[in-house]
């Protein structure tokens, strides 16, 4: 899929849902590619989890690292379903997509696939738009995000939180766009990614 097609597929349509955390996700094999997407904030519970920005250690790792507690909880609630999709589906590549809160979850999904399935590392790519920071500053796992491409608009406030002084960082490569709207147009700046893809 081209980026604009991925945007359309990854932001619309029907979703699977974990009721406990209200995490919406979907996956589909198209032309031998397993596409996985996570929906952005869509409910009060989503917003509560966005603001659950304390860091939690990612458990059962030799190399301890920390992640955004709200996004980690959402990711863990759907991890098994994504694992089943990887086991059950036939594919040659994996492409993960997320927008806004979905980008935070997609970042954790990317890391999990990279760590859990070494044979998929060269076949894995992730595109996130309007992603908040997800990973703790002192987490030494940057190499796990070589194939993660972030799209950010300079004036998009969502890409600035949690703030760097809270010891969070972005991961992956960044494709930055100036944006067409004044800084105070918060919603317009955040929703404008489709204009650049």
Each model region followed by its residue ranges:
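Non-catalytic, mobile gating and regulatory segments of ester bond hydrolases
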Residues: 1-97, 101-197
């Amino acid at each position: 899929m081209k980026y604009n097609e991925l945007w359309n597929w990854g932001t619309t349509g029907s979703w699977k849902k974990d009721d406990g955390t209200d995490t919406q996700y979907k996956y589909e094999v198209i032309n031998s590619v397993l596409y996985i997407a996570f929906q952005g904030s869509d409910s009060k519970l989503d917003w509560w989890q966005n603001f659950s920005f304390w860091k939690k250690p990612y458990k059962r790792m030799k190399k301890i690292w920390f992640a955004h507690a709200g996004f980690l909880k959402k990711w863990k609630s759907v991890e098994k379903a994504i694992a089943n999709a990887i086991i059950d589906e036939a594919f040659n590549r994996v492409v993960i997509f997320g927008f806004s809160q979905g980008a935070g979850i997609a970042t954790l999904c990317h890391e999990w696939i990279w760590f859990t399935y070494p044979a998929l590392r060269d076949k894995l790519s992730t595109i996130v738009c309007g992603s908040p920071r997800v990973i703790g500053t002192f987490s030494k796992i940057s190499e796990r995000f070589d194939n993660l491409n972030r799209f950010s608009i300079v004036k998009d406030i969502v890409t600035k939180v949690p703030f760097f002084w809270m010891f969070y960082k972005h991961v992956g490569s960044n494709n930055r766009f100036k944006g067409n709207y004044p800084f105070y147009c918060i919603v317009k700046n955040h929703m404008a990614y489709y204009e650049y893809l």
